[in-house]
Amino acid sequence: MGGECGDAWGVAESFLNTLAGPWDFLDPRYPVPQHICEFTYDLIQQGKLTFDKSENDDKVMTFHDSCNVARASRMGDTPGGQFEIPRAIIRATCNHFYDMDEDTIRDRTFCCGGGGGLLTDDLMELRVKGAKPRMDALNNVIQEKGVTHMAAICAICKTQFSKVLPYYGMDMSQIISLHQLVGDAIVLTPDPEDADDDDDDDDAD
């Protein structure tokens, strides 16, 4: 399973079956490789996850499409899944979500400015300049819709934005993981079998 990392997912989606397969001994219901967002989305579609979206009401969300995920890979069974699946997860876990301008998202997304080996403090000036197109789009949706946080599913993007957001008058905490939203909103209910076990323990006492 691929995590929230654009580079790792690009490699896994393109080459994992070729280099490390075949995976015919695994459950055929799950594609190999599978992104963590696909796995979470499948559970949501099956009704196996319950969320209290109000737990994320302190956030007004937008989403950054990371380069490697947006233009060098895919998710799910339909074209464009890499764009729609993360947004579906946000909508399932949050009450307030707004996309940035259409010309700045999905396959027209901007680089975060930290990829391609630039993620070093020695190149901070270049990184800040490289992030400007995304920062401008983010600032626009902040002004127009009151967005407070931006989610991303790439470790490089999240690290980059946590460093450069303050250069644009924003807080480093405004970039978050998609699955942070999942973790904050998920409702954990006890398994009925666990409850039966507790009853048995009480009877034994």
Predicted regions: what they are:
Residues 1-205:
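Iron-sulfur cluster-binding electron-transfer modules in prokaryotic oxidoreductases
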